[in-house]
Amino acid sequence: MRVAGAAKLVVAVAVFLLTFYVISQVFEIKMDASLGSLFARSALDSAIRSTKPPRYKCGISKACPEKHFAFKMASGAANVVGPKICLEDNVLMSGVKNNVGRGINVALVNGKTGDVIDTKYFDMWGGDVAPFIEFLKTIQDGTVVLMATYDDGATKLTEEARRLIAELGSTSITSLGFRDNWVFCGGKGIKTKSPFEQHIKNNKDTNKYEGWPEVVEMEGCIPQKQD
């Protein structure tokens, strides 16, 4: 009886050890597979991150150098989609912000700090040009001025208004016509003509939309005003 009992004990221990061994092997295989999947997924995520193109402020195509403000802007599309003005990854004016309108849309920015001073739009089709002229006269030296048309930005413009905008560095303002698309970035006190200006004429033979030219876009880096 003692021999039979001992034999049963030996068998039970052997079965236990065998079961433990099998379970440990299966667990180890699963663990290896899980770790392998984890490392493979991490490597894939790293590869995706390394191949993803970098995003620059306002979505411009390349980074601006130090002491420059990144900007991107677009005119309105016909009389349907309003213009958009972005500076340093901050959308200053857009249809989503509900602060744009028919005519000339203007954003004023401190040329030293990049802080927004004011945003306004002036109706140059059914409005009065006088408030626009007074607004232009109040702009202080060192202010960055960004302008974009929507629908029609020229019908009510007078020679005085055009002259004041030209003093901000614009070249195309003298020829801006009915329903032309135009974007401009200049500054009060600028000594030369601004390199940041795009203008597309309203031409029935080349217009993208019925009665309006295509949207005009522009991006760049504005030098920060130094003391």
From Swiss-Prot:
The keyword Secreted applies. Keywords: Cytoplasmic vesicle, Developmental protein, Disulfide bond, Lectin, Oncogene, Secreted, Signal. One of its GO terms (molecular function) is cytokine activity. It comes from the Eukaryota. Disulfide bonds join 58-86, 64-221. Residues 67-225 form the GG-type lectin domain. PROSITE patterns: GG_LECTIN (PS52031). GO terms for cellular component: cytoplasmic vesicle; extracellular space. It holds the Pfam family ILEI. Residues 1-24 form the signal peptide. It is found in: Secreted; Cytoplasmic vesicle. One of its GO terms (biological process) is neutrophil differentiation. Belongs to the FAM3 family. May be involved in retinal laminar formation. Promotes epithelial to mesenchymal transition. This is Protein FAM3C. It comes from Rattus norvegicus (Rat). The lineage of its organism: Eukaryota, Metazoa, Chordata, Craniata, Vertebrata.
